[in-house]
């Protein structure tokens, strides 16, 4: 253990190859798929709406693989940006960069490799999708640095996590209609809300270390702010359903999602770390409920 109470692993050069690969797997959060799922669901919402059913299989493959690649790259650059902070935060002090098991240079190479593979996949799609991928890279790479300068990194995360939505419409339809931007807005609201649950877990550590978040900004009004965010998300998804002329299955999916969100408020009402983290994880089911509603609704036309 170091003087800061951080478990120190052997230097990267002393690790065996299986150990080193294990640390890289942890670096890209291969052991924690929740982030990929939270990125996958809105991407699939967009693909199914844009195609009015099952999207072209190659397009579906590119976006599904791209979700994992870009989310993994985002985790790497986030840990690189937070390597000064993570050793002092209970939840993050065992991350590979925080312990020294992976060096900063290695992390940057992993980030570049993941983004290059993702970009190579995008190059197989139309030119508009390729062009839209450029701001997507900027959003993913710049997000981790915002927590030093603004209390709204969760909003920016929503912009980054949802960028696959306009890209999906561009890939399938060759343009991004108003429906795509409405769905993008709904995702920004959703991601801001679920990542605020996540930020509530780290709030005490973030205050101590000078990091910023919506959880700190909202303070004692956090649950009220969360309610407003989820209500605005629901209202935007209602507009999506009306504009896309979706049937009963979609509205049933929205109803199920609303009940799932209500459960999150119930378990996190005392703002304890464990329940707030469970509320964050629970949003996977919210995304799934909305996707099932969309998929069944468009299949039944």
Swiss-Prot record:
It is a multi-pass membrane protein. This is 4-hydroxybenzoate octaprenyltransferase. It comes from Xanthomonas axonopodis pv. citri (strain 306). Its EC number is 2.5.1.39. Catalyzes the prenylation of para-hydroxybenzoate (PHB) with an all-trans polyprenyl group. Mediates the second step in the final reaction sequence of ubiquinone-8 (UQ-8) biosynthesis, which is the condensation of the polyisoprenoid side chain with PHB, generating the first membrane-bound Q intermediate 3-octaprenyl-4-hydroxybenzoate. Keywords: Cell inner membrane, Cell membrane, Magnesium, Membrane, Transferase, Transmembrane, Transmembrane helix, Ubiquinone biosynthesis. Belongs to the UbiA prenyltransferase family. The chain crosses the membrane at residues 34-54, 57-77, 108-128, 163-183, 221-241, 245-265, 279-299.
């Amino acid at each position: 253990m170091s003087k800061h109470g951080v478990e120190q692993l052997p230097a990267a050069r002393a690790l065996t190859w299986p150990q080193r690969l294990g640390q890289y797997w942890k670096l890209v959060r291969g052991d924690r798929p929740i982030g990929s799922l939270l990125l996958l669901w809105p991407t699939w919402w967009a693909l199914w709406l844009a195609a009015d059913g099952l999207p072209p299989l190659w397009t579906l493959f590119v976006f599904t693989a791209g979700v994992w690649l870009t989310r993994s790259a985002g985790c790497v650059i986030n840990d690189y940006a937070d390597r000064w902070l993570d050793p002092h935060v209970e939840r993050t002090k065992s991350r590979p960069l925080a312990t020294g098991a992976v060096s900063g240079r290695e992390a940057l190479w992993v980030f570049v490799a993941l983004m290059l593979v993702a970009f190579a996949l995008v190059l197989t799609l139309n030119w508009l999708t390729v062009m839209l991928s450029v701001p997507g890279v900027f959003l993913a790479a710049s997000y981790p640095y915002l927590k030093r300068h603004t209390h709204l990194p969760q909003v920016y995360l929503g912009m980054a996590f949802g960028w696959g939505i306009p890209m999906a419409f561009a890939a399938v339809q060759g343009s991004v209609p108003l429906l795509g931007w409405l769905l993008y807005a709904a995702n920004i609201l959703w991601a801001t809300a679920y990542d605020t649950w996540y930020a509530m877990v780290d709030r005490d550590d973030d205050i101590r270390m000078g990091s910023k978040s919506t959880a700190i900004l909202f303070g004692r009004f956090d649950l009220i702010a969360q309610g407003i965010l989820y209500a605005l998300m629901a209202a935007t998804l209602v507009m999506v359903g009306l504009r896309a002329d979706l049937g009963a299955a979609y509205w049933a999916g929205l109803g199920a999602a609303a009940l799932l969100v209500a459960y999150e408020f119930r378990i996190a009402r005392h703002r304890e770390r464990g329940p707030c983290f469970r509320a964050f994880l629970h949003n996977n089911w919210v995304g799934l409920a909305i996707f099932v509603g969309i998929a069944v609704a468009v299949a039944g036309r």
